[in-house]
Amino acid sequence: MIHKQQLQAYLQLTRIDRPIGIYLVLWPALWALWLAADGMPPMSILIIFILGAVIMRSAGCVINDYADRHFDGYVTRTCARPLATGQLTERQALKFFFVLCLLAFGLVLFLNPFTILLSLGAVGLAILYPFMKRHTFWPQAFLGAAFAWAIPMAFAAIQNQVPWQAWVIFGVTLVWALVYDTAYAVADKEDDVKLGIKSTAILFGDRVQEIIGFFQAIMLLGFLWIGDLFGLSWLYYGSVLIAAGFFVYHQYLLSFDQPQKAFKAFLNNHWVGLVILIGIMLDTL
């Protein structure tokens, strides 16, 4: 029997009250669905991908906290997480992770066999990412691959194939993760250095703002390429221009060289994904 406090701890573990991660997974998946279908995708597939984004992001948070269980207690921002405080055990967290993965897999079973096969990659990347912080300064790239994996799955679900153009969207989404998760890592930089945890924020050092700016420029070029590949019109390119405006704002926030401002830039990034989605939707009406 799960008590009320335990239920709250499980919900806290999923960060369901902080939907930013869901948005960052969901928007690129919806870009891909709309582009693959050249308009509104079938409602059943749309619902599966929305629910899948919520469940797999939750699963990713659970396995992330499991991987960081020996570190979170020493970091100001994470010391109240359920595994760090002992509200939940390691065994309970692992069981919960596998239950969430089974729920997500149950959804995927309603799709074609190719998409089912690709879904195994999503689980593998979700498990791999949190452990990369100990081995490479580029864990953000692994996060990007995990968040972008819904893109080939979306094309597979709609077209039963993954054309090379889908991998362009995948690449842009991966670069986007380098942008927003580096800003996120700035907030934990001081604690991460003490604990020996690696990140792009540490790797880039004093040049973090300009390197994020470089990746933002790569993203904008990628968005322009996507527009050309899929024959999109000025409606889409208008959304790219608005996205560029958001990036200018993020650069302004990063210029303060303050963890709180960098975290605000991270949170604001989901508007980039949403405005691009709106541009694609309007263009494919």
Curated annotation (Swiss-Prot):
Annotated TM spans: 20-37, 96-116, 138-158, 166-186, 211-231, 234-254, 262-282
UniProt keyword annotation of Nucleotide-binding present: no
Broad class of enzyme this protein falls into: transferase
Coiled-coil spans in chain: none
The entry's keywords: Cell inner membrane, Cell membrane, Magnesium, Membrane, Transferase, Transmembrane, Transmembrane helix, Ubiquinone biosynthesis
Co-factor requirement: Mg(2+)
Organism domain of life: Bacteria
Database matches in CDD domains: PT_UbiA_COQ2
Membrane topology designation: Multi-pass membrane protein
Single Gene Ontology MF annotation: 4-hydroxybenzoate polyprenyltransferase activity
Main location: membrane
Pfam families cross-referenced by the UniProt entry: UbiA (PF01040)
GO biological process, one term: ubiquinone biosynthetic process
Compartment list: Cell inner membrane
The reaction(s) this protein catalyses: all-trans-octaprenyl diphosphate + 4-hydroxybenzoate = 4-hydroxy-3-(all-trans-octaprenyl)benzoate + diphosphate
EC annotation from Swiss-Prot or TrEMBL: 2.5.1.39
UniProt entry tagged with the keyword Membrane: yes
NCBIfam families documented for this protein: ubiA_proteo
HAMAP family: UbiA (MF_01635)
Family designation: Belongs to the UbiA prenyltransferase family.
Annotated protein name in UniProt: 4-hydroxybenzoate octaprenyltransferase
Name of the gene encoding the protein in the UniProt record: ubiA
